[in-house]
């Protein structure tokens, strides 16, 4: 039963949090490279 509404939660979660996380990691990586 939970699988019915799981995609409606998972899609926005992946669509918003994954890009934000990758942006943050990329930003930290660039900052470390710049400082080093």
Curated annotation (Swiss-Prot):
Subcellular localization(s) per the UniProt record: Plastid, Chloroplast thylakoid membrane
Any GO CC annotation of this UniProt entry: chloroplast thylakoid membrane
Record keyword Flavoprotein present: no
Source taxon at top rank: Eukaryota
Topology in the lipid bilayer: Single-pass membrane protein
Chief location: plastid
The keyword Thylakoid appears for this protein: yes
Transmembrane regions listed in the UniProt entry: 9-29
UniProt keyword annotations, A-Z: Chloroplast, Membrane, Photosynthesis, Photosystem I, Plastid, Thylakoid, Transmembrane, Transmembrane helix
Gene Ontology annotations of biological process type: photosynthesis
SUPFAM superfamilies given in the database record: Subunit VIII of photosystem I reaction centre, PsaI
Function noted in UniProt: May help in the organization of the PsaL subunit.
Family: Belongs to the PsaI family.
NCBIfam families linked: PRK11877.1, PS_I_psaI
This protein's name: Photosystem I reaction center subunit VIII
Organism, scientific name: Pyropia yezoensis (Susabi-nori)
Taxon lineage: Eukaryota, Rhodophyta, Bangiophyceae, Bangiales, Bangiaceae
């Amino acid at each position: 039963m939970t699988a019915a509404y799981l995609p409606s939660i998972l899609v926005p979660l992946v669509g918003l949090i994954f890009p934000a996380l990758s942006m943050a990691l990329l930003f930290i990586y660039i900052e470390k490279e710049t400082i080093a």
